[in-house]
Amino acid sequence: MESINDVSEICLQLVNLNYSDQLDFKLNLIKQYIPNLLTNQVIASPLVDNYRNKLRFDIGLSNHDLITIGYSLPKKKNTHRYVYSSISMKHLHPKMIQIVSKIELFLRTHEQSWYSIKHGETLLPSMTIRTSFHTEDVMIIFKFKGPQNETVINYFSSDIFYEIIESIEINIVIEFSDCRKIVKGHNYIHEKLDDYIFKITDESFFQVNTLATEVLYNKVLELTMKYIKPTGQDILFDLCCGTGTIGIYLSKIFTKVFGIDIKQSSIIDANHNKLLNNIPNIEFICNPIENVLEKLISECLEKNPDSTFFAVVDPPRTGMHGGVQNTINNCPNLEYLIYVSCNVVTFKRDMEILGKQFEAIETICLDLFPHTPHCELIVVLKKIDLSIY
């Protein structure tokens, strides 16, 4: 029979290794894909335990017939579909442990037919918690398998619910099949990264390890300053910009920043973050990179032939999409590209194309995901001078 240990080892595969051994494991794993890796260390996360600012939890029956908030095994391994408690897992933020415990108590003591343990399938399969390290903001997103339901809304806005969660100040959103409903507060929280503050909505992407993200962005800033050749007309392209975090972070050393992303909600959030941080020299564009990058470079050169161009890309775990790699290769004026990757497999795949025009000249490995095999890569790519061949 499956057990909580099975679930813990699936979520946190390296949890039984001491931390220095975890870092060695990550480095060796990366070298399997990149044998000529330009570094021999993985920088440690500032926080090894309790580091996550976002987690999704399953809701369902435990093996003791109790409604439980935690994790279940994949279907092929979970014959009973039990959900196992998550509160002892090392990656949870302390507030998450507190919230999970209180909401679990509420669900057990105020049971409803739409998620009852007496029924085969719950209509409340999961919840997500987003929290912050520097602002104390918290948001809970409940997922409901069905259209908007006033009974469900009233349940999570009842006095009894808030009596149980007591002093925790939270924002609550319910994701129905046909809409998202704000039950309490807002559908966003705020988080600080060094001197900057960012709005994070229920749909936003934001790095899951806040303290390590500050290290990550400072490393990107250091590398950018190391390789940029200031002319007074320095232009940055923040590709796959999401909510604008990296572009905003680097904006102080560039004349102009263009953030490009295909997700409209991300661009809306990015523009809000631009105003929140009073960054006048950044422009966010909702469009495929393939459609606008070369055009933007041409327009900048028309305005000022002395313009220099730098790019940073932080794609999702699946890597670059479509023809982005070829689009980047087709920009002769783009001398440097910093590739930030959380997946060495897709980075290697993308480099099979980017490597036709760019070569890696510096790499930093940083642990954003303690107790798991995952690791963040920062790779500086420089345009190859093909004229010498």
From Swiss-Prot:
SUPFAM superfamilies: S-adenosyl-L-methionine-dependent methyltransferases (SSF53335)
Key words, A-Z: Methyltransferase, S-adenosyl-L-methionine, Transferase
PROSITE patterns: SAM_MT_RNA_M5U (PS51687), TRMA_1 (PS01230)
Keyword check for S-adenosyl-L-methionine: yes
Active-site positions on this chain: 342
Signal peptide: none
EC annotation from Swiss-Prot or TrEMBL: 2.1.1.-
Annotated positions binding S-adenosyl-L-methionine: 207, 261, 314
One of the GO BP terms on file: RNA processing
Family (UniProt): Belongs to the class I-like SAM-binding methyltransferase superfamily. RNA M5U methyltransferase family.
Name of the protein in its database record: Putative RNA methyltransferase R405
Organism: Acanthamoeba polyphaga mimivirus
